[in-house]
């Protein structure tokens, strides 16, 4: 018997203008998976949650899809049992499916000594995103696997990474609202099919400020680039009172605010050496509450990435 436990971090994608390109890994929360491999005459994958609930149709789940894809690709004759311990809220724009996918890919790579590079792990893990959302997008996968701020280039697949500036803090607030089924697919369906040249120019300007801010270690510059002329205007209709919540965070000192992934979570970047992140969180949750919507908040930092916790 082989056994391994791997953790992978939550992530927050897009950062305004960087749709499907920008992502940050978060130090908290994190999902973990336990993977047990038993020698067998054929390849078999079983998926469980920590409470023992067995999930049917593993092809429709991120972790199960990754485990099965790797087993098939490398002709692994094992019974593979994957147990997921979810700590990342599911379906709120924090990369829960990416974290499960990444943790499973890292576990399979290590336990079977496959020698996969980071780019190959990204290619394997993205199959879980495809199973979960119907699209192969690498941003959350990169943030969950590698951590930090990542710029994702898909053809050929590679990433460029930056460490966060000292004091950079992320406040995430998630409203408790009704969401459509297969939310990510629906959120993508809202996007415009054509983009005005002026809007594209603005977005390039915003995106370059984010990159320059990370390169210079300038939180204020990063915050000034967390704007979007294309995707956020189309998607914010899914989040009641988004503009008001955004303004409430900026008024108490947040450097910038953006929709985390496909939402409904909203992320604020704060210079924790100058501004109390708790004050920003309170302003955002209060704004939702003033409009009759409950919201949960968390304060975290940029970092994350996948790591092996136990191995035998």
Outline where the language-model segments fall:
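Short beta-strand-to-turn element immediately C-terminal to the catalytic PLP-Schiff-base lysine
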Residues: 25, 143-155, 267-271, 309-311
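Short, well-ordered amphipathic alpha-helical segments that serve as non-catalytic structural scaffolds
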Residues: 61-73, 207, 245-247, 283-284
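Acyltransferase
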Residues: 167-247, 251-252
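Glycine-rich, charge-dense phosphate/pyrophosphate-binding loop(s)
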Residues: 214-312
């Amino acid at each position: 018997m082989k056994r391994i436990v791997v953790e992978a971090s939550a992530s927050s994608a897009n950062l305004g203008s960087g749709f499907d390109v920008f992502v940050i890994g978060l130090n908290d929360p994190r999902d973990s998976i336990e993977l047990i491999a038993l020698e067998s005459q054929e390849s078999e994958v079983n998926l469980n949650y920590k409470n023992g609930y067995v999930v049917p149709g593993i092809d429709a789940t991120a972790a199960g899809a990754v485990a099965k894809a790797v087993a098939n690709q490398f002709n692994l004759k094992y019974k593979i049992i994957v147990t997921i311990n979810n700590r990342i809220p599911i379906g709120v724009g924090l990369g829960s499916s990416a974290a499960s996918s990444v943790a499973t890919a890292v576990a399979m790579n290590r336990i079977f000594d496959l020698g996969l590079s980071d780019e190959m792990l990204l290619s394997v893990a993205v199959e879980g995103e495809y199973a979960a959302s119907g699209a192969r997008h690498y941003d959350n996968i990169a943030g969950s696997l590698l951590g930090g701020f990542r710029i994702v280039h898909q053809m050929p697949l590679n990433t460029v990474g930056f460490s966060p500036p000292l004091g950079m803090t992320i406040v995430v607030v998630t409203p408790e609202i009704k969401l459509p089924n297969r939310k990510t697919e629906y959120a993508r369906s809202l996007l415009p099919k054509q983009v005005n040249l002026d809007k594209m120019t603005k977005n390039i300007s915003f995106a370059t400020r984010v990159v320059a801010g990370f390169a210079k270690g300038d939180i204020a510059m990063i915050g000034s680039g967390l704007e979007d002329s294309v995707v956020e205007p189309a998607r914010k209709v899914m989040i009641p009172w988004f503009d008001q919540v955004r303004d409430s965070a900026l008024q108490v000192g947040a450097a910038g605010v953006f929709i985390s992934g496909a939402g409904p979570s909203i992320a604020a970047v704060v210079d924790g050496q100058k501004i109390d992140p708790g004050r920003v969180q309170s302003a955002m949750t209060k704004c939702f509450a003033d409009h009759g919507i409950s919201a949960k908040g968390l304060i975290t930092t940029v970092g994350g990435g996948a790591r092996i916790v136990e191995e035998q």
